[in-house]
Amino acid sequence: MSELNKIALQILSNGKGILAADESTATMTKRLDSVKVHSDENNRLLFRQTLFSSSSMSECIGGVILYDETIRQRTSNGKTIPELINSSGSLVGIKVDTGAKILAGSKEEKITEGLDGLRERLNEYYELGARFTKWRGVYLISDKYPSKLSISSNAHALARYAALVQEAGMVPIIEPEVLMDGDHSAKDCLMKTSEVINKCYEAVSYTH
């Protein structure tokens, strides 16, 4: 556990933050299309290489979350992307969930998937240079959402993910995101977000 503490402290040292650069290929394609740049693997690499080569990286960024494609790429001079990020003093993270799908028993709410085969993927990501990970749970909010089913199912998935990540020697970022969409009040948002977070803490406590 001391090694995990060391990783967490290094990411947040001197008030630094985390750069989320884990856009999927589809999202990157939309961004490049908006500036009339063809989205192929090389152009996506050039974009990220330029971003991670900034002199400000060492001043502001303690960790960078990558997408599966990116952690496997090499720069024009032969460095791996993780090596480029490490050279600025930042640590490499990786998004490990595989996206949200409709939750069984619900017509609208979602469950984040990716637990199948996760232990093996984590071991590979560690060898590729990752030292922390991210998993995002998504919750709708309305007069009837998030339901007890959604809250408990996503909390359980987040807790299992976190336990596997720590087993692999990495720090898990747990991201329970209650979406802002809707006409609910700030009070309702606070109440339901608190319920989600409390359930996540409870689930994590059972696996550690």
Where on the chain are the PLM-derived regions?
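Alpha/beta catalytic barrel-like cores
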Residues: 1-128, 141
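Alpha-helix N-cap and loop-to-helix initiation/capping positions
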Residues: 39, 110-117, 146-157, 184-196
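Conserved, mostly hydrophobic/aromatic
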Residues: 40, 135, 174
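Alpha-helical scaffolding segments of alpha/beta enzyme cores, especially the outer helices
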Residues: 49, 120, 124, 153-167, ...
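Hydrophobic residues within beta-strands of alpha/beta enzymes
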Residues: 64, 133, 172-173
